[in-house]
Each structure stands twice: as structure tokens, then as C-alpha cells.
């Protein structure tokens, strides 16, 4: 036995309390010659083998019955490639020694990871299949700077933390190890002796695949190939493009009728994708697909930020789904949750025994609304972990946009907190300066690294400049959900039409701030849960009036400036709230033609008409693209406006939000001529009363509303009509 290895070191190594296994294990130069040491629990016989010849070079002596072997090779002076012939339970196995390989992470990578400027940390950290010195295996690395010891445990070593302790790179706090023979498909975790001497078993923060709940192991999985976005996909995200988003929860869009089980990614590719295309939507937005332990979180409490959930299939199945959407001309938006994470023991919480990813003070690090933990954006490695994740989904899966969840909870330290429950920033303010900088940096990097990709913010306050450049004080998002518009218009629509005249401003107020941001008009999943009722059920009146109100509202929404978003089920007026544990109520579309079919046809026509006419989308964020024609007729609850494209082509939109038809309704227009009714939400095609204007109307040289020419229309009850000028 070498004089350098004393009994205390062996005991610590076997007990899993030794932080530097490479200083003991592997091949070492000693005064007696080359010495090979190995920790092989349960082994009875160990020989050193030279692979070139297959010859036994020397036998290792068992110095501790718990599995510590050591032997000197006196005839050898220079290091050489070797293998170990190990006998376990009477059977000999030829293995490569993990402790004969040098450091894995390049110095530049380690420096960038420590600086928080490694744009793609997932290419270095985590588990990656590799070949080293002709040996195939997997290199593992994990950031845990305060751990006393870290081991890889998995199916390849009986989940025994003694067998594969890792090397600590002190300059970066990263532990690393190459394990020969570990391969794709095998499960693994990291076993940590944490800063307090406690044992923790953690999933890999960078795992590309993970087990489905209730299991929590990570899975070795190759890094997906890069996806290059085509020109059409890039154009589809632009400010002047028609954007109509179908928001989907993959687990409840449709289920198998025989067992209520989810559709797989591939089944969704075959069913959801063609349906969304047929309906005329331009984008699919997916509620979070990151692996998550609790179905009831809808994915908004992820534990596997880099792993698509296994509920619906494999990582490659998810890529198949994305490819199918792109082939159908649909861009894909992913709901992304960088604002918080769950406190499950196997995940990021107190990862190495310290508050590594989260703040230590609960006034900063604990989200009391959701019982989750808040990322410490001021720690470079943490913000780098998140920025890298954004690029990962876009570059490796072809995700076209990220919709960032709960931005307000990120940028305000006092979000949902009472006095005394939060800590001011360094200037005494309520803004989370680190989170703001993180969002700006993420958006900047997306813009620089992924051409055509965009981000969207769900931001519920009046924070100024969410979609403005960081250099002007903004956050740098491309789009922001207009939650104010959504609340105001839904509050208006749920009123009995008799009372709407007193709340006329709820429909007009949105234009006062419309050009402060680049808005998306969202009727999202949040509006059909928690006792809020379905959108249909919020409408007043009897069944006929409920459907008429809904159709009028959709006609108004699709014509109003801003991109469109509709949660699944709303396109056919589902009557009950959304239930994440069940399929949508597709049975409402079974049997004979009914009101639900009418709404579905309307949404389809709205989408296709909206996409066809540039006036409805080209200048959403330019004042020239919108003009009120009638804004003050609150007594009759009538509103009329014009949408306009760059060439000056106009579409007139007129809404009557009472059940009383308005005959001979005259209003001034900008462009005289022949106007065709291109959409009428009261059409019998949508199960309306079929009141209208016979298809075409001609303007009169009669002054009205301060304009020289005017139209005289019949405005159907509880309806919106669109008119297009088609000639003099």
C-alpha cells in the first residue's frame, strides 16, 4: 500500500465524505512505480489489463473489504491506457476506469459559465454522450459549488453513490466525471453530500429528458440537432403580420374516449395541427411542456426546464409535433416560466445545501401565492441557466416564440406582498432590478442569436415600456398581452345590454393607450377557470342572446388593433369551464348543425378574413391603421371604426351591442363608393337572425359626423359587421 494513502482517506472515500477522488483513485506516479487504485464495492478480484495486447499487467490487492483495491506496476514508468478486469459474484467484467480521464470542461467554458455569459450552458453542463480516448460513455457535470461531495448515481452503478464520485473544478464550482459505458436511455441523478453534511438526491437541472411523475430521475439523452428557421416562419412573427394564436393545453385538448388518456405528441400532430390549420390560426401556443410533477399546475411549476414532459411521449416525439406544425404553416409559441420553481426536494430547492438557485431570504425567494421559490437573478450562473434555456427551445426545437409567464411577479419585489413582507432594492424602490436586467438581457440575446424569433410578456401592470428597447428603458419584449383590454371588454360584455350605455368607455378606453405597447388581445386559459365561467356563460340573456353576444364580441376583437389569442374550446363556445383533467366538450359539435357550429364557423371565417386583408393587421401598432368613425353613440351602444393598411385601403367595422336592430343608421366615411359586407356575425351561416344589408351598399354624398360622404346601414342586433370598399 502506498504511504500516501492512509486509513482515514480510505474510510472517507468509502463513506462518501471525500471531496477529491481523483487525488486517490486512478493511476498515480509513486516512488515504487505506477500505482493504480480503484474503489469497486463487492468486487473480489481486480487485474490491470493493457487493451493493446489484452495482457494482464498486474493484480490489485484488496486493502479494504468494502472494495478499495490498490496495486503497483513496478515495470511501468509512463502512464498508459488501461482497463480493469473485475470479478463480481464470480463473473469477470472488463471495464474502463473513470478515474484515468483528465478534466472535461475546457477552461474557456468554465470561465464563461462562472461569468454567466455562456450563451449555451446546456452544451457543457448536464449529461452528454461522448467518446474519450476511444472509449464511449457519458460525461456528466453539475454546478454545486458548496457541496462537499457529488456522485453520479444511476442504472449503470446500482444507484450507489460510492462508485462514481466526481471531480470538483474549484474555479467554477462545477463537478464533472466521464463514465465509460453509460449510454442514452439510462436513468441517473446526482447524489450530493451538501454543505451541511446532509445527503441529497437531485435530478439534473440540465436533463434533456426526465421521468414522468411520480418518478423523478433524469435520463441520458443526446442533444437535439439545431433547427434553422425558414424565412416564412420569421415573417409570420413580424409586427405587420396577421397573428392569430390558438392557445392549447396538450393534456386536455382531446383525450381518448375509452380511457380518458392523453393523446401522444404524434397523435396531436395528426389531429391538433390539421385542426388549427383548418380553423385558420397562424400560431399554436402551448401551455408549458417542461417536465412538472403536478398536473394541476398545468406546467407552470416546472422541475425539468430542459425536458419536454414524458406525459405525451419522448423528446423526439415532441420534435415531430413541432415539425408537423411548421409543415402546416403554423408557428409555435411556448409558454416559458423563468419566474419561479417548485420546492420539491428532488429539484432545484437548496440544491447543494445552500440557497443556490433561489434567494435565502423568503421575502425575496418565496412566492406565497403559489408556494414556490423565486430565482436569484442576480447570481450569474442562475440567470445564465435561464437564458440558455430560452435559446435551447428556440435553437434545438424550432420554437418560434416564448410567452413569458407572470412577468409582473418578477419585476416587482412587493408583488402580492404586504408591507414588511418584501425588501426594497438598493435604491429603496420596489422594482426587482436584477429581474429587469435578466429580462432585458434575455430578449437582447434572442434578438441577436435567433433571427425572427420573438418573445411575449404576460405583464399585468402598467410598467412602462415592456415592448420598448432596453436602451430607452424598456424590457425589450416584442409583444405584451393586453390584460387591461381583456378585463374591460369582458366586463362590458357581461352587462345586460340595457346598462351598456353607461359603460361605453370600457370599449373605447383601450385606444387611449393602444400605441404605448405592441399588444396581443388575449382570451386565455386564465379566463375560463376558478369560477370565472366560460366566455359563453358570461354573456347575458337567453341562449340566443348569449351566442349572439359572443359572436359580436369576437367580431369586435378580431378587428380591433392587436394580435389575437384564443384559448381552446372558445372557438366553438364551450359552455363549461376548462377542466385540465378532461377533454374539451367536442360532443357539442356532434349531431345536427347548432349554435356551437355557428361560432366555430365564425372563428374560422374571422381568421381567414383577417389574414386576407392587410388593413386588419398591417398597422396594428401605427396610429394610421385605426380611426374612429362613431365613438360617442353610447345611448345605442354602437361603435364604428376604420382599419387601414399602408396603401390606404380601409375596412369599416360596425358593432351594435344591443338586441335592437338599428335601421337607417347613417355615419360619415372617408372613402365614398361601393362597400361590400365581408363579414356579419348575425348571418344565418352562424345561426344569427340574418339581418344585414343585402351584401353591398353605396355611399351617399350626405354629410355626417363631420365627413362629406356617408353610409346608411342596417346594424343587426348584437352583432358586428365588416365592410370592404370594392369600387367607386
UniProtKB/Swiss-Prot annotation:
GO molecular function, one term: cation binding
GO biological process assignments: glycogen biosynthetic process
Recorded GO CC terms: cytoplasm; cytosol
Keywords from the named record: Carbohydrate metabolism, Glycogen biosynthesis, Glycogen metabolism, Glycosyltransferase, Transferase
Active site (catalytic residues): 405 (nucleophile), 458 (proton donor)
HAMAP family in UniProt: GlgB (MF_00685)
Family, per entry: Belongs to the glycosyl hydrolase 13 family. GlgB subfamily.
Organism: Salmonella typhimurium (strain LT2 / SGSC1412 / ATCC 700720)
UniProt-recorded name of the protein: 1,4-alpha-glucan branching enzyme GlgB
SMART domains named in the record: Aamy
A Pfam family annotated for this UniProt entry: Alpha-amylase
Recorded metabolic or biological pathway in which this protein acts: Glycan biosynthesis; glycogen biosynthesis
E.C. no: 2.4.1.18
Cited Gene3D superfamilies: Glycosidases (3.20.20.80), Golgi alpha-mannosidase II (2.60.40.1180), Immunoglobulins (2.60.40.10)
Function: Catalyzes the formation of the alpha-1,6-glucosidic linkages in glycogen by scission of a 1,4-alpha-linked oligosaccharide from growing alpha-1,4-glucan chains and the subsequent attachment of the oligosaccharide to the alpha-1,6 position.
Assembly information from the UniProt record: Monomer.
NCBIfam families, sorted: branching_enzym, PRK05402.1, PRK12313.1
Catalytic activity: Transfers a segment of a (1->4)-alpha-D-glucan chain to a primary hydroxy group in a similar glucan chain
Amino acid at each position: 500500500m502506498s504511504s500516501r494513502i492512509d486509513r482515514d482517506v480510505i474510510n472517507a472515500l468509502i463513506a462518501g465524505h471525500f471531496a477529491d477522488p481523483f487525488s486517490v483513485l486512478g493511476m498515480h506516479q509513486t516512488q515504487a512505480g505506477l500505482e493504480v487504485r480503484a474503489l469497486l464495492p463487492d468486487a473480489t478480484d481486480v487485474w490491470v489489463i493493457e487493451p493493446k495486447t489484452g495482457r494482464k499487467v498486474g493484480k490489485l490487492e484488496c486493502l479494504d473489504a468494502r472494495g478499495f483495491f490498490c496495486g503497483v506496476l513496478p515495470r511501468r514508468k509512463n502512464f498508459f491506457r488501461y482497463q480493469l478486469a473485475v470479478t463480481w459474484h464470480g463473473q469477470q467484467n472488463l471495464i474502463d476506469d473513470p478515474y484515468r480521464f483528465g478534466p472535461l470542461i475546457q477552461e474557456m467554458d468554465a470561465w464563461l459559465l462562472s461569468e454567466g455569459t455562456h450563451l449555451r450552458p446546456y452544451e457543457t453542463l448536464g449529461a452528454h454522450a461522448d467518446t474519450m480516448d476511444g472509449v464511449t460513455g457519458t460525461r456528466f457535470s453539475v454546478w454545486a459549488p458548496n457541496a462537499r461531495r457529488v456522485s453520479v448515481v444511476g442504472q449503470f452503478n446500482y444507484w450507489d453513490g460510492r462508485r462514481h464520485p466526481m471531480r470538483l473544478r474549484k474555479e467554477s464550482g462545477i463537478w464533472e466525471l466521464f463514465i465509460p459505458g453509460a449510454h442514452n436511455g439510462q436513468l441517473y441523478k446526482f447524489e450530493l453530500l451538501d454543505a451541511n453534511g446532509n445527503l441529497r438526491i437531485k435530478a439534473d437541472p440540465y436533463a434533456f429528458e426526465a421521468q414522468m411523475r411520480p418518478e423523478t430521475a433524469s435520463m441520458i439523452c443526446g442533444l437535439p440537432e439545431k433547427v434553422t428557421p425558414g424565412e416564412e416562419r420569421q415573417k409570420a412573427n413580424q409586427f405587420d403580420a396577421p397573428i392569430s394564436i390558438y392557445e392549447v393545453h396538450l393534456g386536455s385538448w382531446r383525450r381518448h374516449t375509452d380511457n380518458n388518456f392523453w393523446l401522444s405528441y404524434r397523435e396531436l400532430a395528426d389531429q391538433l395541427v390539421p385542426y388549427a390549420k383548418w380553423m385558420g390560426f397562424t400560431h399554436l401556443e402551448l401551455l408549458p411542456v417542461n417536465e412538472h410533477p403536478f398536473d394541476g399546475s398545468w406546467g407552470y411549476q416546472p422541475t425539468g426546464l430542459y425536458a419536454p414532459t414524458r406525459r405525451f411521449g419522448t423528446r423526439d416525439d415532441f420534435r415531430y409535433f413541432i415539425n408537423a406544425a411548421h409543415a402546416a404553416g403554423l408557428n409555435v409559441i411556448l409558454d416559458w416560466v423563468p419566474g419561479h420553481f417548485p420546492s420539491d426536494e428532488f429539484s432545484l430547492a437548496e440544491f447543494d445545501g445552500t440557497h443556490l438557485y433561489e434567494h435565502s431570504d423568503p421575502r425575496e425567494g418565496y412566492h406565497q401565492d403559489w408556494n414556490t421559490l423565486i430565482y436569484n437573478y442576480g447570481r450569474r450562473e442562475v440567470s445564465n441557466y435561464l437564458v440558455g434555456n430560452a435559446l435551447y427551445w428556440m435553437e434545438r426545437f424550432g420554437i418560434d416564440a416564448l410567452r413569458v409567464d407572470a412577468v409582473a411577479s418578477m419585476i416587482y419585489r412587493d408583488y402580492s406582498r404586504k408591507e414588511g413582507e418584501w425588501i426594497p432594492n438598493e435604491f429603496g424602490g420596489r422594482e426587482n432590478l436584477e429581474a429587469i436586467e435578466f429580462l432585458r438581457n434575455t430578449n437582447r440575446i434572442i434578438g441577436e442569436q435567433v433571427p425572427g424569433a420573438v418573445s411575449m410578456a404576460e405583464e399585468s401592470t402598467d410598467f412602462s415600456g415592456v415592448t420598448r428597447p432596453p436602451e430607452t428603458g424598456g424590457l425589450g419584449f416584442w409583444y405584451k398581452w393586453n390584460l387591461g383590454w381583456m378585463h374591460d371588454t369582458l366586463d362590458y360584455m357581461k352587462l345586460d345590454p340595457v346598462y351598456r350605455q353607461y359603460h361605453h368607455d370600457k370599449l373605447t378606453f383601450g385606444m387611449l393607450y393602444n400605441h404605448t405597447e405592441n399588444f396581443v388581445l388575449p382570451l386565455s386559459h386564465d379566463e375560463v377557470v376558478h369560477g370565472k365561467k366560460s366566455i359563453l356563460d358570461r354573456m347575458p340573456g337567453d341562449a340566443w342572446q348569449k351566442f349572439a353576444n359572443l359572436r359580436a364580441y369576437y367580431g369586435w376583437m378580431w378587428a380591433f388593433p392587436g394580435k389575437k389569442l384564443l384559448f381552446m374550446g372558445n372557438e366553438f363556445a364551450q359552455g363549461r369551464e376548462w377542466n385540465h383533467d378532461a377533454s374539451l366538450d367536442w360532443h357539442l359539435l356532434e349531431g345536427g348543425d347548432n349554435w356551437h357550429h355557428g361560432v366555430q364557423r365564425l372563428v374560422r371565417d374571422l381568421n381567414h378574413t383577417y389574414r386576407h386583408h392587410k388593413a386588419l393587421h398591417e398597422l396594428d401598432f401605427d396610429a394610421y391603421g385605426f380611426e374612429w368613425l362613431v365613438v360617442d353613440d353610447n345611448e345605442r351602444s354602437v361603435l364604428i371604426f376604420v382599419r387601414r393598411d399602408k396603401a390606404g385601403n380601409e375596412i369599416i367595422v360596425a358593432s351594435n351591442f344591443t338586441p335592437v336592430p338599428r335601421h337607417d343608421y347613417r355615419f360619415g366615411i372617408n372613402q365614398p363608393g361601393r362597400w361590400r359586407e365581408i363579414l356579419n356575425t348575425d348571418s344565418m351561416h352562424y345561426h344569427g337572425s340574418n339581418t344585414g344589408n343585402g351584401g353591398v351598399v353605396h355611399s351617399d354624398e350626405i354629410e355626417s359626423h363631420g365627413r362629406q360622404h356617408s353610409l346608411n346601414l342596417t346594424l343587426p342586433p348584437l352583432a358586428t359587421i365588416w365592410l370592404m370598399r370594392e369600387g367607386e
